[in-house]
Amino acid sequence: MTSLQQQQQQQRVKYGPPHHIKRRPYHPILESLEFQTNQHLIQEYSLDIVNTLSQLESLTLVNPAMIDLQPEIQWFMRPFLLDFLIELHSSFKLQPTTLFLCLNIIDRYCAKRIVFKRHYQLVGCTALWIASKYEDKKSRVPTLKELTIMCRNAYDEEMFVQMEMHILSTLDWSIGHPTLEDCLQLAIDSNNLSNNTTNDIENKSVRPNRKSSISSAVTAVARFLCELSLYDKYFLSVPPSLIAITANLLSCSMLQIPHASITLKNLIEQEIINPQQKKQKKAFSSNSSRTTTASYTHQNQSDVRHSSFDEDIDLDSGDEGDDDEDYIDEFYETNNYDDTNATTFDESINKSTTINDENQPPQIHTPFLSGLDEDSILSIKKICLMLIIQLSKVTEVLSKKYENLGVIQVINNFHSNYKFIIQSIYENQELLLNTINDSTNNNEIDYKLIQSSEILLQFPKFDEYLTEDEDENVSTDDEANSQPQGYDGSGSDGNNQLFTPKSPNAFSSNSSLTLNNHPQSMVPVTPPSATSQYSLFSNKNNRTHESTSGLNSTCNTPTHISISSFAPPQPPPGSILKPKLTSINSTNSLKIKKLTSNSNSSNINIHHGHHNTKQEKRYSHISIGSNSSSKYDGFSPIKSISTNGSLITNNGSFTNIVNNTNSSSPLMNQQQQYYHQQQHQQQVTQSSLYQHHHQYHQ
């Protein structure tokens, strides 16, 4: 019986879809043929695709001022919802475009309808459901049961259906939008990255349609920056194409790839610099022709009347009939011909076409969907500054998502290479946010901040092409500041040169963007790690003097990951980075180390006994030996070097070393020179006091 039952069970018919089917590998020849035909079809419709995306970009922009009018929803709730949607997106393994389209649907709906606090999560999940239907395949679309489970049964299945109908009717059933992923792919394709993969059909491990390692790395870092831009309010008012272009430039700069900078340079030269140079040449030629004709007519005037002013007053008075004769004489003297009415049919057509071209939309270039002009270039630099500020607010969900891909390590290396510039941006973020949010002063951003964004982006340099404002700023900076040679590529003939990425610090001592501009430095949003340079645990002397009581709840992100490079480094108040030192007479603010010059060291002998006690009382404000080292001595990466080329040890002795000033930044060198001058004056005054005291006791 057992054998018969087993046979019957084996012969039972199973209904439904088959289970546990092994996937067969797709044939490489078919894959290569499909890839080639797909690329051929896309190239035929490339112009139509770009034009459609540019039209959708202008139609689907979100006004953040309308979201400000929401009675219950606040901007600090956005990161919480976004973290939840990122977790859902990664758990369902949806396409990257789905997440960006979901956020656009949420913002467009919140800009038109009032959303209550209890329905904010319902709107987000329904928008993700709509976007997955629009972008992903059917098997990846989450079901209503899964959405209710993810929301912990806070909403019924019918509520998702009702909210879907309400969102679609509010948006007039127009869901299409050029997402950040679409614009990012256009920007990466314009980089012309070399494809390292081969079309070898026999090698099945390498697919012909797989991107190269370079393009995949650029895509990962740029996608991280695009997702980071979703957290802030400012990026809603900027076209997504410019955000994607900035993310592409910044990712190539982080990976030290020059392709994006080269393509941007070629575009700017073709579309901005060359037309302006042609206009300038035409204007110069027209002005020169006018001057030459004027000189020739002046030379041809043989009958010039030389008379006094009194004689010219009554000249031709009463001879009104001679006006026509005077006009005829002037006409033959100048030999000018009025051709206002002598135009042909072709010339009239050309004039009408030029007039109509002025009212046409700007010409679309492949990554720039909103047009390429000087305003778009300036907005790219602003977006770069805002992305650098957003790097200090990375949430734990976003960092875990990209940690396995190596994106976090790339950003840490980028921060360590440009830490002085990034630190200055963090110091002046309040000024930057005020100027960006203010509509009247939108274009009045500090030139040093713009220059720092150019360094971070590896922005192409144009030595011949500078605007009038940049010429004035560069000339005033060169006159006011005397920077050492070797920086920014400016030697003896280094005027009007922008800073190169090889010199990470682009600031001078006379600038308002000093590293310690504010008396209270900003508390880092993310706690520093134990291995970082600016960590509180990196130095043994820094254990008991610091506390985290200064942290408050004003941050707009829910949970921050402890990555030291994302947090703005905090310069201590007593470090060498301070731009202005106090006077020598102030005993509380400045402590002088007990030093003796090499020339007077053999002649000065301080006796032991009660004289030393008096001397210690008299010079109690002078710190001696190891007591002089404050808790912030280990902060600066540049050690303090004395004027005679010797390093000061903790015991008060000297060890002769080579006087090698740090060449990392001109700001540090200028501040060190000022500090050394003050220290030298203090040594001279101190040695004279010791000599006077020694002679008095003798």
From Swiss-Prot:
Keywords: Cell cycle, Cell division, Cyclin. InterPro entries: Cyclin, Cyclin-like_dom, Cyclin-like_sf, Cyclin_C-dom, Cyclin_CLN, Cyclin_N, Cyclins_cyclin-box. Pfam families: Cyclin_C (PF02984), Cyclin_N (PF00134). Residues 1-11, 670-690 have a biased composition (Low complexity). One of its GO terms (molecular function) is cyclin-dependent protein serine/threonine kinase regulator activity. Residues 277-302, 493-520, 528-567, 659-669 have a biased composition (Polar residues). Residues 310-326, 469-480 have a biased composition (Acidic residues). The keyword Cell cycle applies. One of its GO terms (biological process) is filamentous growth. Residues 1-21, 277-326, 469-577, 599-619, 659-698 are annotated as: Disordered. The keyword Metal-binding does not apply. CDD domains: CYCLIN_CCNO-like_rpt2, CYCLIN_ScCLN_like. PANTHER family: CYCLINS. Essential for the control of the cell cycle at the G1/S (start) transition. Interacts with the CDC2 protein kinase to form MPF. Belongs to the cyclin family. This is G1/S-specific cyclin CCN1.
